[in-house]
């Protein structure tokens, strides 16, 4: 599924990634069924897998380390979100493990520019070649948006969290929509070439408003695996974007 990224420039990779509006939080499923999930997602032409790497220090939870990235099939695009105390070390390990997209937390590193600059020089394998590492920055609900201004030229993805990492306290929908509007206003003409992502316990009811605002992608985990209906739920979520006119990525059965 990721062979189409082989040999593309960073700008071309970003444009292609922007046509995939769903990243599946694969760790939210039952791990014993992981092989089945991956087969189902591949059959659905769903290439983006989202992995939350938590170390129990940046936030209370502990999930997996960079080693897990390398255990997933190379055919997928591995979309890694770092919520760790040492983002520099984790970023290096994730590149070595084959992560295609790496998103850092704005609150988690005093040397963000250094880490992002280094990531901008890295490439990782895809089927039939390599692609540049795509860089992201993520913000907790209470983090001022303007912290991203100094690093805008060093990121391709801007991710807004709708929950506080590890605690589960969600933003009200109205506050989330207002935050998206504020981000778009802040970006202005610098919006071009950026993928805007919303992550954190979203519901389908929120999607129409977010899509109408112009976001590019959502991350969903538990909602997709609910009732052991990954295929049906994935199709249903993607269909929300299909209504909005973005049908590039959809298989004919969706």
From Swiss-Prot:
One of its GO terms (cellular component) is plasma membrane. InterPro entries: Aldolase_TIM, Ribul_P_3_epim-like, RibuloseP-bd_barrel. The lineage of its organism: Bacteria, Pseudomonadati, Pseudomonadota, Gammaproteobacteria, Enterobacterales. The active site is at residues 52, 199. NCBIfam families: PRK14057.1. One of its GO terms (molecular function) is racemase and epimerase activity, acting on carbohydrates and derivatives. Coiled coil: none annotated. This is Putative epimerase LsrE. Belongs to the ribulose-phosphate 3-epimerase family. Binds 1 divalent metal cation per subunit. The chain crosses the membrane at residues 14-34. It is found in: Cell membrane. Its main location: membrane. A divalent metal cation binds at residues 50, 52, 81, 199. It comes from Salmonella typhi. The gene is lsrE. GO terms for biological process: carbohydrate metabolic process. It is a single-pass membrane protein. Its EC number is 5.1.3.-.
């Amino acid at each position: 599924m990721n062979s189409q990224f082989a040999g593309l420039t960073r700008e071309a990779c970003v444009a292609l990634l922007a046509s995939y509006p769903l990243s599946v939080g694969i760790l939210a499923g039952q791990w014993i069924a992981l092989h089945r999930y991956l087969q189902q997602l591949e059959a659905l032409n769903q290439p983006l897998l989202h992995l939350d790497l938590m170390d129990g220090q940046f936030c209370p939870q502990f999930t997996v380390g960079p080693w897990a990235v390398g255990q997933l099939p190379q055919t997928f695009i591995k979309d890694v979100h770092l919520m760790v105390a040492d983002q520099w070390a984790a970023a290096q390990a994730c590149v070595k493990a084959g992560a295609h997209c790496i998103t850092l937390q704005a609150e988690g590193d005093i040397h963000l520019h250094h880490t992002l600059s280094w990531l901008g020089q890295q490439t990782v394998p895809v089927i039939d070649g390599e692609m540049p590492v795509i860089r992201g920055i993520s913000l907790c609900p209470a983090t001022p948006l303007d912290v991203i201004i100094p690093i805008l030229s060093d990121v391709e993805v801007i991710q807004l969290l709708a929950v506080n990492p590890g605690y589960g306290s969600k933003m009200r929908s109205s506050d989330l929509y207002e935050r998206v509007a504020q981000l778009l206003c802040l970006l202005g003409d610098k919006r071009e070439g950026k993928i805007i992502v919303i992550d954190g316990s979203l519901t389908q009811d929120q999607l129409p408003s977010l899509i109408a605002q112009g976001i590019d992608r959502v991350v969903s985990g538990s909602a997709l695996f609910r009732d052991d209906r990954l295929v049906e739920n994935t199709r249903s979520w993607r269909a929300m974007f299909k209504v909005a006119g973005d049908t590039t990525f959809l298989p004919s059965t969706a």
